[in-house]
């Protein structure tokens, strides 16, 4: 395997699930996991890659149970958005402790806590080598953080959306329940839809497809995987318009 001397991506949008931050814990934020992820992002900054981040909120708030109990979906989604802001603040703090400049931008105004999302400002920050953490999803209920990741990725003209998961990429079947499941190296948008593979929700996926935004799914729990993806090594599954 030949290693490229420099990164194949100049600007990326990294999507982290909230659950990824909880480590082995069942809830909340695991400090060691948070620091490890901050170090992996720091490596990319040192390579000259511009990094935007979207983090989910599932480690702090899960609306499904409350929705079943009768909570209004809009209220639940607003609570979920605030959970992503909390994760964003934690990630910014971890990056600052690793001597990496980072800004948190929120799609809903939270004066005194973080910056309001502003497209031009986000681009300027990225160009200055700062990590920009986009929080509060899209700012609208009924949209997932995967949708927010694809939307922000398209807006900042990222080269790729990197979706960090607990498995090595996209498989023919669930690798947890089916040990014979095979890992796909590359997929087209159409084949993902045809095979009904669960990469992300349909709204997010079709947004990426319609704007020709490549998605790479990889395992963030694998040390060095993020760097390997950015350096163009074989890691995870690439989804693009190429058949």
From Swiss-Prot:
SUPFAM superfamilies: Carbamate kinase-like. UMP binds at residues 57, 77, 138-145. This is Uridylate kinase. Residues 23-28 are annotated as: Involved in allosteric activation by GTP. It catalyses: UMP + ATP = UDP + ADP. Keywords: Allosteric enzyme, ATP-binding, Cytoplasm, Kinase, Nucleotide-binding, Pyrimidine biosynthesis, Transferase. Its main location: cytoplasm. It comes from the Bacteria. Pathway: Pyrimidine metabolism; CTP biosynthesis via de novo pathway; UDP from UMP (UMPK route): step 1/1. It holds the Pfam family AA_kinase. It is found in: Cytoplasm. One of its GO terms (cellular component) is cytosol. Belongs to the UMP kinase family. ATP binds at residues 15-18, 58, 62, 165, 171, 174. The keyword Metal-binding does not apply. The keyword Cytoplasm applies. Allosterically activated by GTP. Inhibited by UTP. GO terms for biological process: 'de novo' CTP biosynthetic process; UDP biosynthetic process. It comes from Aliivibrio fischeri (strain ATCC 700601 / ES114). One of its GO terms (molecular function) is UMP kinase activity. Catalyzes the reversible phosphorylation of UMP to UDP. Homohexamer. Its EC number is 2.7.4.22.
């Amino acid at each position: 395997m030949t290693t490229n001397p420099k990164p194949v991506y100049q600007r990326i949008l990294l999507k982290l699930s909230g659950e990824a931050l909880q480590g082995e814990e069942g809830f909340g934020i695991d400090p060691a996991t948070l620091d490890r992820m901050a170090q992996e992002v720091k490596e990319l900054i040192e390579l000259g890659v511009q990094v935007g981040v979207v983090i989910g909120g599932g480690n702090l708030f899960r609306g499904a149970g409350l929705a079943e109990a009768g909570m209004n979906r809009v209220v639940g989604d607003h609570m979920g958005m605030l959970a992503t802001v909390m994760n964003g603040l934690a990630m910014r703090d971890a990056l600052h402790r690793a001597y990496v400049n980072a800004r948190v931008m929120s799609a809903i105004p939270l004066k005194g806590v973080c910056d309001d999302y502003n497209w031009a400002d986000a681009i300027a920050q990225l160009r200055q080598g700062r990590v920009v953490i986009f929080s509060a999803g899209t700012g609208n209920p009924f949209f997932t953080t995967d949708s927010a990741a694809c939307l922000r990725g398209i807006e900042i003209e990222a080269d790729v959306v990197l979706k960090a998961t607990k498995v090595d990429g996209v498989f023919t079947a669930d690798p947890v329940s089916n040990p014979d499941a095979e890992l796909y190296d590359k997929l087209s948008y159409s084949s993902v839809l045809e095979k009904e593979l669960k990469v992300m929700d349909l709204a997010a996926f079709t947004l990426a497809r319609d704007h020709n935004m490549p998605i790479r799914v990889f395992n963030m729990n694998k040390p060095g995987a993020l760097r390997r993806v950015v350096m163009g090594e074989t890691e995870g599954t690439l989804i693009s318009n190429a058949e």
